[in-house]
């Protein structure tokens, strides 16, 4: 009789000398190098640890259960005109040299300090960036400024309170936010910005690092905040701020909510400290959740309507014969194409009247009536309606 033979002592046995089947329980830790030939169909339920790359695709005929929902709100992007397409004011290059905000394009406003520390800003067109960017806002420093501790220099957008209700900011159950944008600068290093509430007593400074003159897609996740007051009506819900070089008094610790007015992060670079330095941005998106999704592309008509809630300019001269109320008082109703946020401030310009002058009366978010106070019955004019935050 032969003694028991251990399979561990058998080597170099030709496959043709092996017959029968091997129980599944006898197979373990089988390396991929030991497999060859055609494999039988595999049940996917038995596979674990199988990764899928971003270039791969999966076909399914069943139901997919997602582990997280990015957002159930449409549109996702709370930023309006994030691709810098709409410029109803038709502003060209603006010189920013005071705290009075100026609009290089719709919904975006910039402020600064004195003329000795000024910079310019403009909406620009880009032939090719390789990142789907066709328009941007471009800041250019006019000198190497000596920034004071209390100076504020920024580019920002104010988001209406109604549009942030989905976030439940300042409450238990507050949602995270995902901020993304495409940016480049001639100044390499760590740049910064901030998210602020209306009262500017809650701020979240953020940072992003750039290589000089190279476009970068930036993604930032902003954690929930369960304290502070956040407007959820027609006022300012949030400010999204990009810092151009504010002073130390308006900078704070990055990547946390601070109970202060922070325009940027402590230690970040300042565009204004370098003469001729440039900074450009486009594709700005702020959405609910912990995932930065691809930039939400809107039809230009949709984007225009969203912008018109805050600013409208009727650049073609209106020609109207007035309805005769009495001998010296003539009125004509004018309706806005889009209901505005609040009753706007009206500017009636390029007037050509038969009689005295025209004025906007009975102004509401829906329109106004044009009044010709005089003996004439014909008037021509253009109007500008402003209901910015």
Model-derived regions: residue spans:
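Intrinsic low-complexity, repeat-rich intrinsically disordered segments enriched
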Residues: 1-76, 287-295
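Extracellular and organelle-lumenal recognition/adhesion modules and their flexible linkers in secreted
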Residues: 68-389
